[in-house]
Curated annotation (Swiss-Prot):
Its main location: virion. The keyword Nucleus does not apply. This is Capsid protein. Residues 681-692 have a biased composition (Acidic residues). It holds the Pfam family TT_ORF1. The keyword Endoplasmic reticulum does not apply. It comes from Torque teno virus (isolate Human/China/CT23F/2001). One of its GO terms (cellular component) is T=1 icosahedral viral capsid. Residues 44-64, 580-602, 638-662, 678-699 are annotated as: Disordered. It is found in: Virion. It comes from the Viruses. Belongs to the anelloviridae capsid protein family. Keywords: Capsid protein, T=1 icosahedral capsid protein, Virion.
Amino acid sequence: MAWWWGRWRRRWPRRRWRRRRRVWPRRSRFAVRRRRRGRYVSKRRRFRRRRRRRGRPRYRGRRKKRQTLVIRQWQPDVVRFCKINGWLPLIVCGSGSTQNNFIVHSEDITPRGAPYGGNLTHITWCLEAIYQEFLMHRNRWTRSNHDLDLMRYVGVRFKAYRHPTTDYIISYSKTSPFQVTELSYLSCHPLLMLLSKHHIVVKSLQTKPRGKPYVKFFCKPPKLMLNKWYFTKDFAKVPILMMWATACEPRNPWLGEGTLSPCIGFYALKPSIYTSLSNLPAKVQMFATGTQSDSLTTSSTGFYKTVHPSSITTTSKEWEYTYTGLMEKFFKQATNKPYNWENYGTPADYGSTYTTFSTHRSTRYETIKKEYQKVYPTLTTQTPTNFFLTQEFGFYSPYYLTPSKRDIDWHTPYTYTRYNPLADKGLGNMIWADWCSRDEAAYSPTQSKCMLKDLPLFILFYGYIDWVQKSIGSQTITRDMRLMVICPYTEPQLVDPQDKTKGFVLYGDTFANGNMPVLAPQIPISWFVRWYPNFAHQREVLERVVSCGPFMVRDQEKNSWDITLGYHFLFKWGGSPLPSQAIDDPSQKPTHALPEPGTLPRILQVSDPARLGPKTIFHQWDQRRGLFTKRSIKRMSEYSSDDENFSPGPSKRPALDTRPEGLAGEQRSAYAFLRALQDSQDSEESQEEAPLLEEQAHQKEKEELLLKQPQQQRQHQRVLKRGLRVLFGDVLKLRRGLHIDPLLT
């Protein structure tokens, strides 16, 4: 619409003459800049004014055909407009959990002394997630969706409330795919979000004292969503919006208030000392003594032969590894001399100290073994057979890793490293996750998982543990996997000059002193006998590196912070429900004692969108002459809602959590049988091409395969049945025009 159309406004009452009165714009109250006077043009009329014709104006020329058509859809019999108003804890973070994704840990029950939540959040909104928020009494529905199996999504209006002291950044996407990749969590870093093209900065009341206490913004439906009615059951799990946010510190972005330097320090195991990192019994035995558990061959290399031998010579330097404050009590029990490097470094005093320490170690190990058998009597196969991985005397014991050295110039099995986040360019950095059973420290494309590189460490560590857990699909990675790092921007550099692919194992002061990350000073016996570096012990280092980064909230200044987000989702429910009950005469109603009014607010009856489908409710066409048809009764009797009353416990992941990259569960099962058919066909062709002599040589193997063939066929049949059901359902939806864009799901 052109801007000058507003001048031709119709006045009431309608005038008799044809021309409308021209309304000129009012004079501005404020001073405005005037246009420069142009060249004088004569206003003499050069032509005769044409007289307008009465009636409808006629235009000459041939009418062209319309290029596009607007396809309309009939509305259902009943349409109800619903507003879903509620509040969401967008970010809840305790000190020590800055690196975590809050949505992933929102339903965690943390142990005593452990922080809760996370500083970043990455959520995906869908109708099922909104219903789960309703079950937690966090939102209110203005209209009920009961017996209405159709829906339309209109949009959502958000209201981001300003925190008194914490600023935060919000960004969202309406374009599919709504999935997380290896770069999704680290892209939530405040530095990268401020550099992104589209973002919303919600300033705190301390940063911006004036203004409204909230920031409002409206989000339209997804790009690939059609403006039509969908079945609620099919649309319940369809993502409609992906949002991510993080708290930031714009007032002191580069250096925390009250700190002297942005540099931090942590520890790294020396690859020359810890040549084996596996926790398997055979590997542990070989690394400890240089002898295989099933062999009599002995190697000259071994951890205890290098770090803590039973005897030394006058020229050896092995005593320096154990010259710590923890060995002082054993030295004084064995000798009456003062504890210094001259006395401890002599072969006689060192040997007597080792004998005292060895006796204490044997006695203590037997006590630990009995305690483990008492606590876990059924786990006899997992009873420790040696002390090599125990917390008190193992490879990673505080007797060897303690930072309380008498002198920093003595030999140590670790390296103290300093890191400056302002000097990290990112090029050459590399991190990955290895299973604790893996022996080597070098990166392997087949065995190593979740490799990221060429970004600063404070960005790579942001949400990395949550991404590894989501990518691997295991809930026990904190104890079964460890972090490997290569970084040339530390002092000294975490780069092996002989092997550029060899990584370093990082850990903090808590693990070096032999303490638990939580529940300190207590250590469970299951952790005590399996003490080695993993994500649970390395989380402290990741937290320190993340907290020192630019624009990051400093948990040293505040213990916790939380962000609240308000939302107003707009939906339309539709359907053809049964007619309401007949109207009765009020005077004929019986009387009874009036009950006391309740104290709780009355809420609407809201049905689960995932179960609200055309087969689970009655419609108007299900009645004939006031009675339900046999087909409708049979359909409803097949559906049982008894399972809804039994709670299966906490869900595996929150409903707002964004799923990882890849196909959905139903699509994955649908396409699995096609790959199974292709693999079986390829194997049959390869068997037909095999020569006769080769078949006779492998006759025994074929017999074993024949025995396993019925079990494999039954498994393939189950996969085929599940896949065909999904495919046929998609075909029927496509023919009826009820399909949803696969990129949205």
